[in-house]
């Protein structure tokens, strides 16, 4: 069927190989934007808009990718410009996400296709003239018209409370000019793989009959376990939008790490199966750093949930204190041989899982993960929407990690983790959460 998800089709492995080839050609994210500190706010805007319009995760992740890399190349200096670019990225990304299922193979879309997006003001009469459209793309564009009801209209976007509360209204003329600018900035190639494009394919092998829970007994119901793991994986997938540090990894690595982190949280053994290694071509060692970052965020949210519950109960008079309940009980692990000062930091089930997970790695990892930060020289006035200079960004000598998660209900934690949380060789700088 034409609407069959690609990961369930007969050419799933071929599509996966094509996506893996395309991700190798993705540009490097330099974190040079002078408005990088506003990134999380606009990611939240895109998330809420996509949820309001019921867009798929692939559209949301592609929209954030387009916004990040456009900000990385151009001096978007005003909030009006950033709102306009964000909405345009969402509409363009949704158009591409609707085209992809019709082609059944993401690699079939030409890098120079003339996109005519229903619901937007992009039209062939006013658009620049790219190279000729391949026959399969032209055929698909015609079939795309009957899905116009799935594309949010500009009036629908403007009427949302998210934008109206900011006194923001986007005109068709502004949308047209911004769409054309985005298409030219990406050389008319919007078919870019994101972690959302890989996740469902890896979820096919996420649970098996051979899995054990808590290292002791087999899972009694693989179907329910897989459903629960899918919820975890999609949660971790949304977590990756919150920080540009995940651009340090290839999209397929991030997607596989979401599955790996989910298996760790559900205490499925082994943490990474042979089927997952075969389908993704990644070993646990390849995913270790990315998984650790995701587990730190997960631990943050657990602590926040316990704190919120305690505060709510404290406001009710006559309510006796209740013991803290966790989603699962930590299994009994053998001694890990860690220093006492390091073990003292691990007091929650998730932290115990992190230790056990780290101990399960066979090869010692070397090197550290460094994320770019904006220097003071990048905060000088700029001309609107001009390409950024290719200047190096200084990295501070002492770095720490500030993680915060926005969700509904919104959690606004800002917890500092030193490099000793997992090992002395990893430091995760993330400065984009400063409001």
Swiss-Prot record:
What's this protein's family per the entry?
Belongs to the cyclin family. Cyclin J subfamily.
In what residue span(s) does the Cyclin N-terminal domain sit?
14-191
Say which species the protein is native to. Answer: Homo sapiens
Q: Which UniProt keywords apply?
A: Cyclin
Q: In the UniProt record, which is one GO cellular component term?
A: cyclin-dependent protein kinase holoenzyme complex
Name of the protein this chain belongs to? Cyclin-J-like protein
Q: Which domain of life is it from?
A: Eukaryota
Gene Ontology BP terms:
G1/S transition of mitotic cell cycle
Kindly give the PANTHER family that the UniProt entry links to this protein: CYCLINS
Please name the gene that encodes this protein: CCNJL
């Amino acid at each position: 069927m034409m609407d069959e998800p690609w990961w369930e089709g007969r050419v799933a492995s071929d599509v996966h190989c094509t996506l893996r080839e395309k991700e190798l050609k993705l540009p490097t994210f330099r974190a040079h934007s002078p408005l990088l500190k506003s990134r999380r706010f606009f990611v939240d805007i895109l998330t809420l808009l996509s949820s309001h319009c019921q867009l798929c995760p692939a559209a949301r992740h592609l929209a954030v990718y387009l916004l990040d890399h456009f900000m990385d190349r151009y001096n978007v200096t005003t909030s009006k410009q950033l709102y306009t670019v964000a909405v345009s990225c969402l509409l363009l990304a949704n158009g591409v996400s609707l085209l992809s299922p019709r082609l059944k193979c993401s690699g079939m879309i030409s890098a120079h296709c003339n996109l005519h997006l229903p619901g937007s003001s992009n039209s062939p009469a006013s658009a620049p003239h790219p190279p000729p459209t391949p026959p399969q793309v032209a055929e698909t564009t015609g079939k795309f018209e009957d899905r116009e009801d799935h594309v949010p209209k500009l009036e629908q976007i403007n009427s949302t409370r998210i934008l109206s509360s900011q006194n923001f209204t986007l005109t068709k003329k502004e949308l047209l000019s911004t769409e054309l600018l985005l298409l030219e900035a990406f050389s008319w190639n919007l078919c870019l793989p994101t972690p959302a494009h890989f996740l469902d394919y890896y979820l096919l092998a996420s649970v098996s009959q051979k899995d054990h829970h808590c290292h002791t007994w087999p899972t009694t119901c693989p179907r329910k376990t897989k459903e629960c793991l899918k919820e975890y994986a999609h949660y971790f997938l949304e977590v990756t939008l919150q920080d540009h540090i995940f651009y340090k990894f290839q999209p397929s690595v991030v997607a596989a790490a979401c599955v790996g982190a989910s298996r760790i949280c559900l205490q499925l053994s082994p943490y990474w199966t042979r089927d997952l290694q075969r389908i993704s071509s990644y070993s646990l060692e390849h995913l270790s750093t990315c998984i650790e970052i995701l587990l730190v965020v997960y631990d943050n949210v657990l602590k926040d949930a316990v704190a919120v519950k305690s505060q709510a109960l404290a406001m009710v008079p006559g309510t006796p204190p209740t013991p803290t309940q966790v989603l699962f009980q930590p299994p009994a692990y053998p001694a890990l041989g860690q220093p006492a000062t390091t073990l003292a930091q691990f007091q929650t089930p998730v932290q115990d899982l992190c230790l056990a997970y780290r101990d399960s790695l066979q090869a010692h990892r070397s090197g550290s993960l460094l994320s770019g930060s904006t220097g003071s020289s990048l905060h000088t006035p700029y001309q609107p929407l001009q390409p950024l200079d290719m200047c190096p960004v200084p990295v501070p000598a002492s770095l720490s990690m500030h993680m915060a998660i926005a969700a509904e209900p919104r959690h606004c934690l800002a917890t500092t983790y030193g490099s000793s949380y997992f090992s002395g060789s990893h430091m995760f700088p993330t400065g984009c959460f400063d409001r």
